[in-house]
């Protein structure tokens, strides 16, 4: 993992088209601004993890249904 130090108002750029800016620092919280193309999905980690879990459940259910139909 790359660790960088930034101050309020400073940014970093990822892959030439994603910019992350430190908007505010208050106590132990940091407010980030993210500029990225619309086709780049951006999620908080806890939301992303939940989406992955739901996708796995859905895929498992679809696979189970396909097996039932195949072997009836």
UniProtKB/Swiss-Prot annotation:
Recorded GO MF terms: mRNA 5'-UTR binding
A GO biological process of this protein is: bacterial-type flagellum organization
Q: Which GO terms describe its cellular component?
A: cytosol
UniProtKB keywords: Bacterial flagellum biogenesis, Cytoplasm, Repressor, RNA-binding, Translation regulation
Q: Where in the cell is it found?
A: Cytoplasm
- Tell me the InterPro entries matching this sequence: CsrA, CsrA_sf
One family name in Pfam for this protein = CsrA
Top-level taxon in the UniProt lineage: Bacteria
Q: Which family does it belong to?
A: Belongs to the CsrA/RsmA family.
* Protein purpose: A translational regulator that binds mRNA to regulate translation initiation and/or mRNA stability. Usually binds in the 5'-UTR at or near the Shine-Dalgarno sequence preventing ribosome-binding, thus repressing translation. Its main target seems to be the major flagellin gene, while its function is anatagonized by FliW.
Q: Describe the subunit structure.
A: Homodimer; the beta-strands of each monomer intercalate to form a hydrophobic core, while the alpha-helices form wings that extend away from the core.
| NCBIfam families assigned to the protein according to its UniProt record, in alphabetical order | csrA, PRK01712.1
* Name recorded for this polypeptide: Translational regulator CsrA
**Organism field:** Agathobacter rectalis (strain ATCC 33656 / DSM 3377 / JCM 17463 / KCTC 5835 / VPI 0990) (Eubacterium rectale)
GN (gene name): csrA
């Amino acid at each position: 993992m790359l660790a960088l130090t930034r101050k309020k108002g400073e940014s970093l750029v990822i892959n030439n088209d994603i910019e992350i800016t430190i908007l505010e620092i208050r106590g132990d919280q940091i407010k980030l601004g993210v500029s990225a193309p619309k086709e780049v999905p951006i999620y908080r980690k806890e939301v992303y993890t939940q989406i992955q879990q739901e996708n796995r459940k859905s895929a498992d259910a679809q696979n189970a249904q396909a097996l039932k139909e195949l072997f009836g």
